[in-house]
Regions:
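C-terminal and late-domain segments of enzyme folds
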Residues: 47, 53-136
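Glutamate identity and glutamate-enriched acidic tracts
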Residues: 40, 48, 56, 62, ...
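C-terminal active-site/capping subdomain that shapes the small-molecule cofactor and substrate pocket
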Residues: 96-188
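Conserved anion/nucleotide-ligand pocket segment
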Residues: 2-70, 74
Length: 188
């Protein structure tokens, strides 16, 4: 609903425009129970690993080594009780363009955690029910659009799809197929 959403939506823009990445610094200020739990280093580490992996799967160094091999990526979450359920996310993105010209992108995302999460939970319940009625069982990759960590079969070394627009195409295709129609979105 916040930091990962911004990364999964904005990193494809950087990659599509072939902009280089020098660094991405993200921090969240949370005052709810989520912030309190993540204030513990052991709990934060799990979240940090999932947030860091989002960029690596979208801005793939092997595909464009001159643009994405050596960038600095830092993630922080800060508990601040007066914030309550209001979430504030800051992202500073240092990019470079043609001829190595440095530029910056700043994002200040102010939102309410529960208000962002509640409709996603409802959609997950409804779409899970639809999948069960359609006879779909096991990993439901099309639900990744709603999740921080995309659904994938890690036992088969399947690569998760973190790219928000690809996740959306997968979701639309699955809904069309469950409705008896052919998929109409290509995933590239």
């Amino acid at each position: 609903t916040g930091q990962t959403l911004v990364k999964s939506g904005f990193a494809p823009i950087i990659g599509t425009r072939c902009l280089g990445l020098d660094g991405w610094f993200s921090t969240n200020i949370l005052g709810n129970r989520d912030g309190l739990v993540l204030d513990e280093p052991a709990n934060f580490h799990t979240k940090e690993v999932s947030k860091l992996s989002t960029l690596e799967s979208i801005l793939v160094p092997e595909d464009q080594p001159d643009l994405y091999t050596d960038y600095y990526h830092k993630v922080r979450i800060n508990y601040y009780p007066p914030r309550n359920d209001n979430k504030e996310g800051w992202d500073n993105i240092d990019i470079f363009g043609w001829m190595g010209y440095p530029m910056q992108i700043k994002i200040n995302f102010l939102c309410r955690d529960s208000i962002l999460a509640a409709p996603l939970c409802l959609d997950l319940v409804l779409l899970s029910d639809l999948a069960a009625r359609a006879g779909r069982f096991g990993i439901q990759r099309f639900l990744s659009f709603f999740l921080k960590s995309p659904m994938h079969d890690y036992t088969e070394n399947e690569i998760p799809v973190n790219h928000l627009f690809q996740q959306y195409a997968i979701l639309k295709n699955a809904i069309r197929e469950m409705g008896g129609y052919e998929a109409d979105q290509e995933i590239d």
